[in-house]
Amino acid sequence: MDEKKITMNVRNDELSEESKTLISSLPSDKNSTGVNVCKYQGCWYTPPILQGVLNFQKNFKPQDTDIIVASFPKCGTTWLKALTFALVRRSKHPSHDDHHPLLSDNPHVLSPSLEMYLYLCSENPDLTKFSSSSRLFSTHMPSHTLQEGLKGSTCKIVYMSRNVKDTLVSYWHFFCKKQTDDNIISSVEDTFEMFCRGVNFFGPFWDHVLSYWRGSLEDPNHVLFMKFEEMKEEPREQIKRLAEFLGCLFTKEEEESGLVDEIIDLCSLRNLSSLEINKTGKLHSTGRENKTFFRKGEVGDWKNYLTPEMENKIDMIIQEKLQNSGLKF
């Protein structure tokens, strides 16, 4: 399958009859951008992406060596994909290699989405091109929906979480503004209200994050729960934690040679956003410009957008939803 020749623009009229029948029976709504969404297994999807989810659940053949990068949208997905790729492929692609794949491809190409690319473009895609030793995929599906497609596999799942307020603001910039001319599709206030209702792509946020949090507590060898804020604060400790989980620990020689810092620098948002492929390139699967995947990547940027009243409202929602879970941001 050629990433550069496949389009993700599946229209509603191209849905299978099975998908149409199911969708007609599901709760439906419109998100803040006016897009129709339907609720499946507690999560909101556009109809085409739901078809990708259904195809994945039905036809994916997992391998125990698979690695899946999971996240709610706009929680540091691009960063985590780059780090994971650099870690598990470092024997083949040293971080100092002038021809490292991260220098010529966007991380979303190197870790393709199961439901938004592979199984959206094909009911049963050919996955033979992926490395048999450790195939690398990604998803925005909640844990219980993903697990249905994994069929009991013990593959590794790495989940990146983020403070809800920074997630919301990043979500608004990505989905609700046309990046080329800053045309507002939906105001931050409208996006905020829909977010609080949970009616947003792959939402509700709190159900999504809790599904992986609980999964990491139940089976820590299967699910690693990471936090964007901790990655920013202590990148060396967190990347070593990630390497240990993935079974590719840094050797003493690698640490002494500075490899950990090399990978951190290679995968930094500063470096990735400066690359020509990410300044002028596009994802051929969607047509979206690569530069839209990089904004600030900061902690606390929400303070520039949310009022004290909005802050208080969403904090109260999160406090209620995460109550007694042990999860805090």
Curated annotation (Swiss-Prot):
GO CC entries: cytoplasm
EC number of the protein? 2.8.2.-
GO MF, one term, reads: sulfotransferase activity
| Residues bound to 3'-phosphoadenylyl sulfate | 74-79, 162, 170, 295-297
Q: Which SUPFAM superfamilies match?
A: P-loop containing nucleoside triphosphate hydrolases (SSF52540)
Q: Where in the cell is it found?
A: Cytoplasm
Give a short account of what the protein does. Sulfotransferase that utilizes 3'-phospho-5'-adenylyl sulfate (PAPS) as sulfonate donor.
Identify this protein by name: Cytosolic sulfotransferase 6
Originating species = Arabidopsis thaliana
